[in-house]
């Protein structure tokens, strides 16, 4: 399956194995005028499907930076089928932007023709696995490009789930040839909430399928009886234990494109660049370690 999409995978600009930044509306003008030293930017596909100033800004920014598209609306886990019109709109954005990478979420968000503004978890079953694989195949065929699936952050589990999430994701990649977007913060959040072993999760993912890593902040909410839950809210700096897990991910997967995400209480662009610099330093350390390991 990989070979089918190889010719279009990096149509405009290769996404480098460096730290990039999630591009948000409040930073458009600054990026155009100041041209910060960012390696690449990622945008949410759905934010650039209509008119207004956003697509025009992106057209200008893509002339100077590689762009990755990250979608939230394909609902690849929905049992009622893929929204063909939405898929076509994704394709239209791709034709205009020529992204280096295209990604979506392992989740669902459509039921009864109604779009639910959230990324909802799937039961990890053979039936759900078949549905997701079918949807991913449909998407890749329509888009004529390999897409990557992001592991979710979750706060509950289904009693009838029979497949560990990491095995589910790896199997989708195996069957469809899609990539895996390894969200390290999501792994840490879900592992903390469910009592999973985060390192074992990383080790279960096929390294050759990992095309990108995401890093973001999360919050901790107090529940009753002294319990806590971690919420993937993308509203703060990356937490120290997530940085530690990122170091382990680099050892497992090697240097890969790594994104700093920040979606709530979005700060000045300089703050995101500071976080990207920390990620870049970790990537460079791993790159140097690889050189030492491979030296004669």
Residue locations for each model-derived region?
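N-terminal pre-domain/capping segments
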Residues: 1-92
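Conserved, mostly hydrophobic/aromatic
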Residues: 41, 102, 183, 213, ...
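C-terminal helical cap(s) of enzyme catalytic domains, especially alpha/beta-barrels
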Residues: 269-292
């Amino acid at each position: 399956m990989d070979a089918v999409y190889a010719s279009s995978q990096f149509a405009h600009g290769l996404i480098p194995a460096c730290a990039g930044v999630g591009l948000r509306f409040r930073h458009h003008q600054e990026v155009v005028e100041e041209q910060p030293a960012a390696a690449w930017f990622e945008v949410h596909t759905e934010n650039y499907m209509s008119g207004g100033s956003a697509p025009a800004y992106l057209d200008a920014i893509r002339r100077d930076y590689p762009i990755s598209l990250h979608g939230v609306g394909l609902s690849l886990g929905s049992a009622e089928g893929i929204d063909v019109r939405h898929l076509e709109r994704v394709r239209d954005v791709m034709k205009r932007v020529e992204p280096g990478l295209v990604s979506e979420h392992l989740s669902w968000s459509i039921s009864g023709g109604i779009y639910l503004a959230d990324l909802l978890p799937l039961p990890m079953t053979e039936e759900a696995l078949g549905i997701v694989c079918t949807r991913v195949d449909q998407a890749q065929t329509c888009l004529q490009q390999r897409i990557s699936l992001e592991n979710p952050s979750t706060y509950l589990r289904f009693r009838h789930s029979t497949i560990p999430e990491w095995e589910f994701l790896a199997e989708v990649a195996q069957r469809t040839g899609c990539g895996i977007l390894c969200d390290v913060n999501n792994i840490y959040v879900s592992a903390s909430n469910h009592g999973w072993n985060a390192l074992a999760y990383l080790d279960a993912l096929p390294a050759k399928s990992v095309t990108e890593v995401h890093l973001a902040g999360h919050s901790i909410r107090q529940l009753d009886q002294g319990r806590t839950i971690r919420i993937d809210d993308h509203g703060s700096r990356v937490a120290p234990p997530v940085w530690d897990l990122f170091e382990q991910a680099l050892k497992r997967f090697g240097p890969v494109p790594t994104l700093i995400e920040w979606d709530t209480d979005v700060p000045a662009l300089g703050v995101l660049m500071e976080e990207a610099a920390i990620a870049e330093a970790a990537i460079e350390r791993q790159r140097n370690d690889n050189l030492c390991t491979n030296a004669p």
